[in-house]
């Protein structure tokens, strides 16, 4: 079976990870001790992807929980879901990264990374055919960003041909915890561009907006935000956990969504999102879900897709839905909004249907878009980074851990390059194919794609 190993790093990563496991246990008919109580064979058919069956018949998540301080891990261990995980897979230090990326990446994290790699190796050896890893972390703190990216590069060295997916929570000015978030996030993106295969960008600001505007929660807690994230993670991984044709593993998902290797940062959306009091006043239909799914207010990243163009889109519908109706609706969206889709990637909207709906819903839809508007998010972090870096503010926290200023400049220019690459492909047209601007950069995919585009006109 094509197994996936899940790694939670840092406080945010562990809390999102715990919410994710709670959600998928419910969907697969497992209780929090790992005992199967399901009533439908489809729930059990691909359980092996995320769970390992122990000799007692208990299903154990292929999950590793890592942090540089014991607090969050203790909270997970003592929660309702704590007995589910293998006790040896909790790995924590006694210090803390203190929200400094350099501590997570070069000093404190580097001391712990070997024991994490040992556990990862052991988990990988317990797989028949490992397809890859998924990591949940935040980019604003110290452990999730610094140690998370260190782990990603170590895993890359050791498993170069396996897929690497990350669920990364980006910092946002409205919900800022620490002043150095822009540094941590930029240094992390610098690593993710090189080492990750697919990164699902989640943004605290967008999550707060959804909770307040759409779900009508006045004071959303982190628990509410994590439930939103776990719904999306459950939706994104639907095609990996249930039998189906499209995007049935991480590699196929990447092939369908990533046109150029560096541009692998996705926006995610989810439908239905309704306030608890309004649910009985709405009917869930495929057109309704499709409309809500493409709505900018449902995006979990604070970027507006209307300001850019979609390179590729994948949509997952769950529940008793007609495949034909889904195809028709998606086709309708594309033809009505053709300006928002780049024309040099034909058939760039993929849809998959899974008959198992999320718990408590008749149907739901998850949306993954590779949109050029994600550059807004990187621009925002980049501007904050530049404002601090040109004054060398708080830099001593990083240089005292052995970092060089040069690494900051490299990270800054890598992120600026990423923004301009997204911009370049947003403006590209089919005619640009062979035109080269003064810098010698190609404006769009080159000649080998030309016949394909022509065939579809």
From Swiss-Prot:
Its main location: cytoplasm. The keyword Cytoplasm applies. GTP binds at residues 11, 69, 138, 142-144, 204, 226. This is Tubulin beta chain. The modification Phosphoserine is found at residues 278, 280. Signal peptide: none annotated. InterPro entries: Beta-tubulin_BS (IPR013838), Beta_tubulin (IPR002453), Tub_FtsZ_C (IPR008280), Tubulin (IPR000217), Tubulin/FtsZ-like_C (IPR037103), Tubulin/FtsZ_2-layer-sand-dom (IPR018316), Tubulin/FtsZ_GTPase_sf (IPR036525), Tubulin_C (IPR023123). Tubulin is the major constituent of microtubules, a cylinder consisting of laterally associated linear protofilaments composed of alpha- and beta-tubulin heterodimers. Microtubules grow by the addition of GTP-tubulin dimers to the microtubule end, where a stabilizing cap forms. Below the cap, tubulin dimers are in GDP-bound state, owing to GTPase activity of alpha-tubulin. It comes from Saccharomyces cerevisiae (strain ATCC 204508 / S288c).
